[in-house]
Amino acid sequence: MRFDPKEIGEILEMLLFRELDIRAVTLSVNTLPAIRHRVSDTISALEELLEPYLKKLRPAVEKVASRLGVRIVTVRLAVSPVSIMLEPIGDAKSTVELAYFLDDLAGKYGVDMVGGFSAFEHAGVSRGDRALMEGLAEALNGTSRLAGFLNVASTMTGINLDAVRKSADIILSLKPHAAARFAVTANLPEDVPFMPGAYHGLGLPDAVINIAVSGPGVVEAVVRNLPEADARTLHDAIKRAAFKITRLGELVGREVSKELGVPFGAVDLSVAPSPKVGDSVAAILEAMGLPRVGSPGSVFALALFVDAVKKGGAMAVSNIGGLSGAFIPVSEDAVMAQAAAEGAVTLDTLKAMAAVCNTGLDMIGIPGDASADVVAAIIADVMALAVYLDKPLGVRLVPVPGGKPGDYYDLGGLYGKVAVMEISRYSKIPLMSRGGTAPPGVERLKKG
């Protein structure tokens, strides 16, 4: 597809006036060759393995950004799941040592975030998984760049309720800034460029570049220019805008890959918001005709938007990766955060919207004194949606000490202001104490 002069002008307007940017360039590196039996040896091997890549990463990204005239917001690193690296070591103290090392190494080379401090526990917990869980809260509370997740459910194996409950305990022991870097997930793909879900998957090459795009302001402007359009016309206009946004991600990915000399992996099609004015997914939904995001019609509007983004983005890239849909992180979207604080958006509304988007319950403030039963039940609800709808979803909750519904907690930067939401009138949910594994659903049988 070629751009005519009018379309070129539109892209320039997107870059200059509509906050179009690349959210993240994520370098994903296989760190399993650095596994050793002592944590000190593992750290030495990791340093030797990662430094040649990291020395070139930020200079390469800045060179491409300058040459193309595109703003690239963050530079990120994803490593192999750290729980695997902990298998021969198996203690929480080593978990924390690895965390501090990775955090310091990232700072040394100008890397904004490191993903992969993670474990896959959807069918059970291994020695390395246990070591990671035991040290995870201290690791995240004591670092600023580290991000991680626990994958506790999958369509193929069901939901590990023991891991769900342990995840709830971890969330409640995290400081707000640390909680913003931790998620509980299901069905997580191997090539996610967004944090905290990024990690180097077992099926990937030794190193690969994955790209995360942004651009809600672009789509909002398109929608506002069509106040009388029918649903089909609106869908087509969003689809065309998504093509242009994602095509930029493809170009940046190819150029950075060439500069670094590593393969280009995929572009995550997801349109990600930020706390800036004019960079909101919720504002798009309201421009489509909702009186307020969270009102009746919100799930339909989001479904229409996500479908258009997927179809437009898929045509623009050589390889689709990550979560590829739309993100509705409450605190990272100024309009969504305000609606949550007002009570227009509730936890149940967000659960319903999770059925048609890709993030689940994301960046939601909860009272710091919330019970572990309630937090575990919230996680279990989203894991059920992921397993029985056969899709990736996650939960990222931010406990706010002393916070009450309607309060804000300012995390700053891309995380924005967390709105504390009403989560439950109940404090005890005995179902969450049953433990065990909920078996996979019928979708598992369809896969053979």
From Swiss-Prot:
SUPFAM superfamilies: PFL-like glycyl radical enzymes (SSF51998). InterPro entries: UPF0210. This is UPF0210 protein PAE3581. It comes from the Archaea. Pfam families: DUF711 (PF05167). It comes from Pyrobaculum aerophilum (strain ATCC 51768 / DSM 7523 / JCM 9630 / CIP 104966 / NBRC 100827 / IM2). Belongs to the UPF0210 family. Disulfide bonds: none annotated.
